[in-house]
Structures are given as structure tokens and as C-alpha cells.
Amino acid sequence: MIIFPAIDIKDGVCVRLMQGDPDRVTVYGKDPVSVAKRWEGEGAGWLHVVDLDGAFLRRPANRQVVASIVKAVSIPVQVGGGIRNLEAIRDYLDSGVERAIIGTAALRQPEILEQACGLYRSRIALGIDARDGLVAIEGWKETSGTDAVALAKRFEKLDLAAIIYTDIHRDGMQSGVNIEATKRLLESCSIPVIASGGVHTLQDIEDLLPLVPLGLLGVITGKAIYSGTLRFKDALARVREKCGGATPSPNPRRGE
């Protein structure tokens, strides 16, 4: 199981929001590049970067910051936020980003996700952000009538690297991961899942470990590692202890 440190960028700095609300923001670092290097130094194998301005503006808004992060670290970076067309996907992947995350566009224009998966095999992730089980879009400002599991199953045959599943009610709240909803998604779909939202302590990491055999690829942690309720090194050590130090395949489809 991979532990992804989250770097959320707003107005060029590293922040965390509560439940995606731009009015409930805490700044955790004025230099996202330094933050990225910190997590790499602590042993991170991946970075999860979100362009929050991009999510709200519907277009990438912090490309230069992301490019600087990619150049500064030697570990792979996945990026989401405001990626609505093939041009944005190409620009990110050509700049050295390993994986682009498509959320809103997957629901609004599914052909973009389909084309991207054909062009960039296993370098595309589907971002599913759910509020009470329903997919939220446009920077979480709108809640659709589409069930999260139904959306995942719709794209099951595509060459997706992963689904990044976020429980909006828990994001930034440090109230524990929604194990039940994550398990439901894993049991319904063969695409690997990265869980997000609600990590608070080491216990939350341990609670996710039984889901690894079901296809859980990793977990994203943000506020917990910035506020200090979870030490990143402790989380890594616990996963290595329980999983035997094995590194999962970047695209481990069940049944393949």
C-alpha cells in the first residue's frame, strides 16, 4: 500500500481545505517545492498534488508550481485539479508528471477520459469525489445524481491506473477514512483504488490494510501529516511491517 502525501496548491502556496471549502483554508507551507522535497526526504514513493485554483477555475492554474515540484524531486508525481481536456493532460504528462487525474471531465465529457486512456496507457487516474455516495464535480461545488460505484463500473474496461476515491464529508476533517464506502467500491470494480479523506492517526492506516487484498493501491494523507496527528515515517514503517515491504504494481488489476 502506497502512502501519498498530499500537496494542495492555492494561490501558489501549500494549503489544506476543510471539506473542499475555499473559505476554510489553512496554509501549511509557502513553498510547495520545499514541502515536496520534505516528503521525499521522509521516504515518500509518490506525491499527490492538487491544483485547487485549477479545480475552481476549470483549467490548470498552477502549472509552473507543479513543473517546479516535478523537477525538484526524483519520485513520481500525480496531479489533479482543473484537468478538463486532452491538451491539459498532454501538457502535464510532457512536463514530467507521471499520472493525470480526471474528475469532472469524466462525468461531463467521458470521451476525454476514454481518449486519454488510449493515448497514455496507465498514466490516467479517475478521480471520484463523493458526497453521500454521489459524485461531486466542479471543485465539489455541484453534486450530481450519479452513484460513485456506477461511475467506476462505467469505465472499468479502460486502461486506468487507479481510481482516487475521496469522501468529501471526511476530507480535511480527520474523522477517519470511510472504510465501508471504500470497500464497497473495491468489491464492485476491478480497478485499483486509492483512498482519500479522513486520515487522522496511525490507526486509520491500519484500518485500511485489510483492504489491500481487495485491490487497495494506496491512501492519500494531508492534514494529518501537516498538523502532526500522524507522523509520515510512522505510517510508512507500519505499512512495511504489515505488508512485508512489498511495493505494489502501479496498475495491479485483480484477475490479471
Curated annotation (Swiss-Prot):
One of its GO terms (cellular component) is cytoplasm. It comes from the Bacteria. Pathway: Amino-acid biosynthesis; L-histidine biosynthesis; L-histidine from 5-phospho-alpha-D-ribose 1-diphosphate: step 4/9. GO terms for molecular function: 1-(5-phosphoribosyl)-5-[(5-phosphoribosylamino)methylideneamino]imidazole-4-carboxamide isomerase activity. Its EC number is 5.3.1.16. GO terms for biological process: L-histidine biosynthetic process; L-tryptophan biosynthetic process. It is found in: Cytoplasm. The keyword Amino-acid biosynthesis applies. It catalyses: 1-(5-phospho-beta-D-ribosyl)-5-[(5-phospho-beta-D-ribosylamino)methylideneamino]imidazole-4-carboxamide = 5-[(5-phospho-1-deoxy-D-ribulos-1-ylimino)methylamino]-1-(5-phospho-beta-D-ribosyl)imidazole-4-carboxamide. Keywords: Amino-acid biosynthesis, Cytoplasm, Histidine biosynthesis, Isomerase. It is an enzyme of class 5 (isomerase). NCBIfam families: 1-(5-phosphoribosyl)-5-[(5-phosphoribosylamino)methylideneamino]imidazole-4-carboxamide isomerase (TIGR00007), PRK13585.1 (NF010112). Belongs to the HisA/HisF family. This is 1-(5-phosphoribosyl)-5-[(5-phosphoribosylamino)methylideneamino] imidazole-4-carboxamide isomerase. The gene is hisA.
